Amino acid sequence: MESKSILEELLLKKSQQKKKMSPNNYKERLFVLTKTSLSYYEYDKMKRGSRKGSIEIKKIRCVEKVNLEEQTPVERQYPFQIVYKDGLLYVYASNEESRCQWLKALQKEIRGNPHLLIKYHSGFFVDGKFLCCQQSCKAAPGCTLWEAYADLHIAISDEKHRAPTFPERLLKIPRAVPVLKMDASSSGAILPQYDSYSKKSCGSQPTSNIRYIPREDCPDWWQVRKLKSEEDIACSNQLERNIASHSTSKMSWGFPESSSSEEEENLHAYDWFAGNISRSQSEQLLRQKGKEGAFMVRNSSQMGMYTVSLFSKAVNDKKGTVKHYHVHTNAENKLYLAENYCFDSIPKLIHYHQHNSAGMITRLRHPVSTKANKVPVSVALGSGIWELKREEITLLKELGNGQFGVVQLGQWKGQYDVAVKMIKEGAMSEDEFFQEAQTMMKLSHPKLVKFYGVCSKKYPIYIVTEYITNGCLLNYLKSHGKGLESCQLLEMCYDVCEGMAFLESHQFIHRDLAARNCLVDSDLSVKVSDFGMTRYVLDDQYVSSVGTKFPVKWSAPEVFHYFKYSSKSDVWAFGILMWEVFSLGKQPYDLYDNSEVVVKVSQGHRLYRPQLASDTIYQIMYSCWHELPEKRPTFQQLLSAIEPLREQDKP
C-alpha cells in the first residue's frame, strides 16, 4: 500500500549524470514526498505518468540550498540539493517559498537518519568538480558546515552512552610524574578528581582526591592540588588530554566514528607527521630533502583534515614539484587519498601508499621528519631555577660565540640535544646572570627558545636551552634564501612577530631583536632567542645606563639619542628584521657606518624596499620606523596586518 503523500509539486530536476556520457539536461517532474520515499514522475496533461526515480528517506544524508552558478536563467533561481547514499540530486523550485517548504518538509522527515552529513558542498558539481572547493570526487567530504545538522542529528543522550564533560582518558598520569613543591596555591578551574601517583608514592598506594588546574603563566604545566594539604606541579604533557566536545567528533579529526580509543593512532609518534607546519614550510623541507617520493603528513588549514605533501622530481627538473593531497573521509568513515583504497586510520593509509602510488604522482618513499631530539616538556622547568648536574651534560661541538661566551651543542643525560651557553668568568655579574635565567624561565611560548636549566656552582656557568637544529636565521637566509619564496619569508616574519607579541603582552623588552638572534627549527619555524639584554619593566620603558653597548643599525632614534628602550623600540627592530628577511640576510645600511646611520635615520632616512617584498609588506615594515614611538604599531597590530597576507598560503 502506497504511503500518504506529504507534499507534491511540479519541480525542475537536473540530470544526475551517473554515467560519464550522460547529457547535462533539465526536466520537469512531479515530485511526491511520503514518509518512506521521495519519488518523481513524468507529468503530462495534468496527469501523473510513470515513475522515473525514487530515493528512500532513510538513505538521505543532507538537504540544503545550493549557491547559484554564474548567469543562471530565471527558471533555475531557487535550487536545492538532496545528498543520499547513492548519489546527489539537484532540484529547482519555482520560488523561494516553495524551496523553503520542500527543505522544511524533507528535513523534518530525515531527522534522526544515520550518517547525516556534518559538512556539505555549497556549490554545484560541474565539469567534474565542486565549484565551492574544487574537489573532483563527487563523494568527497563537504567543505561547509551544515547548520541544520545540530537539530537533525539525534544524539545518544541516555546515561549509559552520554560522554562525560572530561572523559576518563582526559588525565592519565604515569607512575613517575616528576613533581616540584609549590608554596602557595593557585587559582583556576578545577577539573574532575582522578587517582594519581606522585613521585613519593610511586609503587605504593595511589594518592586520590587530586585536582588539576591549568597554569596561566605556563600552559605546559598544570597545578596538582591535594584537597587536604600540599600542592604539586604535574606536567600537562604527561596528562593525556583528550578534550571531548559536541563540536569535535572523532570523525572530524580524521578517524572513523566506529573506532575505539585503543585504535586511534597517535600520529605524533610517526616521523612523517609534521603537525601544524604550513604549506610553504612543507614545500621548503621537501625540496631540501630533494629525493623522489619525499613526503610528510600535516594538519590541513581545514579543521579536522590532514594533508599529505609529496615531492617528485622529473628528469631535468632541478626544482622538482610538490603536490598536496587531502585525506578524505567517505560515507563509511573510511580514510582515502585515492577513492578506491580506503583505510581505518592514517598510519594504515600511509603504509599502503608507501608501496603503491595509486593515483598519486609517485609513491611515498622517504619520510621527512621535523622532529628533533629535544628535551620533552615533562622534564623542563616548572617553577624556580633548576640546577642541573654538570656531569650529566656532554659538550659535543662549538656552535658559535655569543655576547658572554661560547655556545656549544651538548647532550643532556646522554639522550637529549641541548644548547649550552658557557658564561666566562667576569663576562657578566652573577646578578645579571640570574636575572637572565629568571627572565627566560618565565617565558613559555612556541616561538621562543625554551630554557631548561643552569649549572651555576662553578665557572664557566652554563645556561642550558633548547637546541634549534638549523641555527640562526641570518645564516639560514644567506645559505638557503635563494630557494625560499616570498610566502615562506613572510611566515618567518610572522613567527618572530608571534614571539614578540607574547613578550609585549608580558611587558618584556628584548632590546636586541635581529635575524642573528632568531633561530630556525627543524620544521622551519623561527624562534626568538638571546634574552641577555631583556628586562622586565612595569612601565614598559627601561632607560639604559650610559656606555651600554647596543646594535645601532637595529636601534630606534630614542635608543641611540636617549638610551630609552620600550616595546616600541622592539617594533622598530622588528621592521629591520623584516628587511633582513626579505633581502635574504643583507646588512642593513650596508653603505654607512654606525655614526652615519645615526645621522641618516635622525634626518628621516629609511631603508629601501627589498626586491622580494611587495608594496604591502614594505608598508608594514615601514610603519615600524615612525620617528615617534607612539605612532608605531604594536606587535599584536602587526600580527593582524600580516595575517591576511598569509591566507594565500593555506591549502
From Swiss-Prot:
Instruction: Enumerate the UniProt keywords alphabetically.
Output: Apoptosis, ATP-binding, Cell adhesion, Cytoplasm, Kinase, Metal-binding, Nucleotide-binding, Phosphoprotein, SH2 domain, Transferase, Tyrosine-protein kinase, Zinc, Zinc-finger
Q: Name one Pfam family in it.
A: SH2
Which ranges carry the SH2 domain? 272-368
* Positions annotated as active site in the UniProt record: 512 (proton acceptor)
Residues recorded with modification Phosphotyrosine:
542
- GO terms assigned for molecular function: ATP binding; non-membrane spanning protein tyrosine kinase activity; zinc ion binding
Supply the CDD domains for this chain: PH_Btk (cd01238)
Per UniProt, the cofactor note for this protein states: Binds 1 zinc ion per subunit.
Q: Which SMART domains match?
A: BTK, PH, SH2, TyrKc
User: What is known about its processing and modification?
Assistant: Phosphorylated in response to protein I/II and to LPS. Phosphorylation at Tyr-542 by SRC and by autocatalysis leads to activation and is required for STAT3 phosphorylation by BMX.
Record has rRNA-binding as a keyword: no
Indicate where this protein is primarily found: cytoplasm
Entry binding sites for ATP = 399-407, 421
Domain remark from Swiss-Prot or TrEMBL: SH2 domain mediates interaction with RUFY1.
Domain PH intervals: 4-111
Quote the InterPro entries the UniProt record gives. Answer: Kinase-like_dom_sf, Non-receptor_tyrosine_kinases, PH-like_dom_sf, PH_domain, Prot_kinase_dom, Protein_kinase_ATP_BS, Ser-Thr/Tyr_kinase_cat_dom, SH2
Q: Where found, per UniProt? A: Cytoplasm
> What protein am I looking at?
Cytoplasmic tyrosine-protein kinase BMX
Record field: catalytic activity: L-tyrosyl-[protein] + ATP = O-phospho-L-tyrosyl-[protein] + ADP + H(+)
Zinc fingers classed as Btk-type: ranges: 113-149
| Tissue specificity statement from the Swiss-Prot or TrEMBL entry | Specifically expressed in the endocardium of the developing heart as well as in the endocardium of the left ventricle and in the endothelium of large arteries in adult mice.
Q: Which organism is it from?
A: Mus musculus (Mouse)
